[in-house]
């Protein structure tokens, strides 16, 4: 999905708008995702990451490794530069 946070995995969700008279209309909620350059200290380089603003606050408070670990993610999912923003399931399998 294009509008998905790499750190938390949050994506677009669907549900109902409920009016005062309890009529239900379908709608979607989009995640506030921005593209941000983050410095990886272990590799001494910058990486572009699609991250939600909520995850960015957590990242600034705790740091990249701790924020990813807290949300059950894997740091290797964002490390390869050409796979930034792609979920681990969608990455091609390396053949040896």
UniProtKB/Swiss-Prot annotation:
Matching Pfam families: Ribosomal_L28
Keywords, in A-Z order: Ribonucleoprotein, Ribosomal protein
Keyword Ribonucleoprotein part of the UniProt annotation: yes
Family per record: Belongs to the bacterial ribosomal protein bL28 family.
Organism listed in the record: Leptospira biflexa serovar Patoc (strain Patoc 1 / ATCC 23582 / Paris)
One of the GO biological process terms: translation
Protein's recorded name: Large ribosomal subunit protein bL28
UniProt-listed PANTHER family: 39S RIBOSOMAL PROTEIN L28, MITOCHONDRIAL (PTHR13528), LARGE RIBOSOMAL SUBUNIT PROTEIN BL28M (PTHR13528:SF2)
MF-aspect GO terms: structural constituent of ribosome
Record NCBIfam families: L28
Sections of the chain in a coiled coil: none
Gene Ontology, cellular component aspect: ribonucleoprotein complex; ribosome
């Amino acid at each position: 999905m294009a509008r998905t946070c790499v750190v938390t995995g949050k994506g677009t969700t669907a549900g109902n708008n409920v009016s005062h008279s309890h009529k239900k209309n379908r709608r979607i909620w989009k995640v506030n995702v921005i593209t941000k350059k983050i410095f990886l200290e272990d590799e001494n380089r910058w990486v572009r990451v699609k991250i939600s603003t909520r995850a960015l606050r957590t990242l600034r408070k705790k740091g990249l490794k701790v924020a990813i670990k807290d949300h059950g993610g894997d740091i290797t999912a964002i490390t390869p530069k050409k796979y930034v923003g792609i979920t681990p399931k969608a990455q091609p399998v390396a053949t040896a």
